[in-house]
Amino acid sequence: MTNIRKSHPLIKIVNDAFIDLPAPSNISSWWNFGSLLGICLAVQILTGLFLAMHYTSDTATAFNSVTHICRDVNYGWLLRYLHANGASMFFICLYLHIGRGLYYGSYTYTETWNVGVILLFAVMATAFMGYVLPWGQMSSWGATVITNLLSAIPYMGTDLVGWIWGGFSVDKATLT
């Protein structure tokens, strides 16, 4: 008589994914960070979406909207802290994921490694845009500091900063 977990069509899917998973015997917790990255990204998207529903970017009301989120929105304080700390956890998991790849020699798979490098650059660009696009209290300062790092590039750095900003500097606390 055959085992039901290997013969039933629906249970077989669960069996193949969880019980008889073809994984090496020396797999460790270092291999969890890809999944943790996905969870952190989902948390960031969801909390950012809910925070954006209550945030206003006007210079006069930006701070008050953050106060409104923390005090008046149900679990708004939790959304704010999950979003802020989730970003840190995302990058910790990202760097540990890269470190695991370096430790185990995953860079020898050049196509896969190059896709990962491109994804890293895309994550960095997205993080920068996520920091600048809400156009909130510290965004102008953060964007100025980050983009002024480009001015360290010889010959063309100052032109790059001017090109990104459409001018050399921004004049308000928020970017509206």
UniProtKB/Swiss-Prot annotation:
Main location group: mitochondrion
Source species, domain of life: Eukaryota
Cofactor section: heme b
Annotated GO CC locations: mitochondrial inner membrane
Keyword Hydrolase annotated: no
Disulphides: none
Transmembrane segments: 33-53, 77-98, 113-133
Subcellular location: Mitochondrion inner membrane
Key words of the record: Electron transport, Heme, Iron, Membrane, Metal-binding, Mitochondrion, Mitochondrion inner membrane, Respiratory chain, Transmembrane, Transmembrane helix, Transport, Ubiquinone
Gene Ontology MF terms: metal ion binding; ubiquinol-cytochrome-c reductase activity
GO biological process: mitochondrial electron transport, ubiquinol to cytochrome c
CDD domains xrefs: Cytochrome_b_N
Residues bound to heme b b566: H97
Pfam families the record matches: Cytochrome_B (PF00033)
Residues at which heme b b562 binds: H83
Cofactor, free-text remark: Binds 2 heme b groups non-covalently.
Membrane topology classification: Multi-pass membrane protein
Record InterPro entries: Cyt_b/b6_N, Cytb/b6-like_sf, Cytochrome_b_N_euk/bac, Di-haem_cyt_TM
Keyword Lipoprotein in record: no
Other remarks in the entry: Heme 1 (or BL or b562) is low-potential and absorbs at about 562 nm, and heme 2 (or BH or b566) is high-potential and absorbs at about 566 nm.
Subunit-structure text: The cytochrome bc1 complex contains 11 subunits: 3 respiratory subunits (MT-CYB, CYC1 and UQCRFS1), 2 core proteins (UQCRC1 and UQCRC2) and 6 low-molecular weight proteins (UQCRH/QCR6, UQCRB/QCR7, UQCRQ/QCR8, UQCR10/QCR9, UQCR11/QCR10 and a cleavage product of UQCRFS1). This cytochrome bc1 complex then forms a dimer.
Main function: Component of the ubiquinol-cytochrome c reductase complex (complex III or cytochrome b-c1 complex) that is part of the mitochondrial respiratory chain. The b-c1 complex mediates electron transfer from ubiquinol to cytochrome c. Contributes to the generation of a proton gradient across the mitochondrial membrane that is then used for ATP synthesis.
Family: Belongs to the cytochrome b family.
Name of the protein: Cytochrome b
Source organism of this protein record: Eumops glaucinus
Lineage of the organism: Eukaryota, Metazoa, Chordata, Craniata, Vertebrata
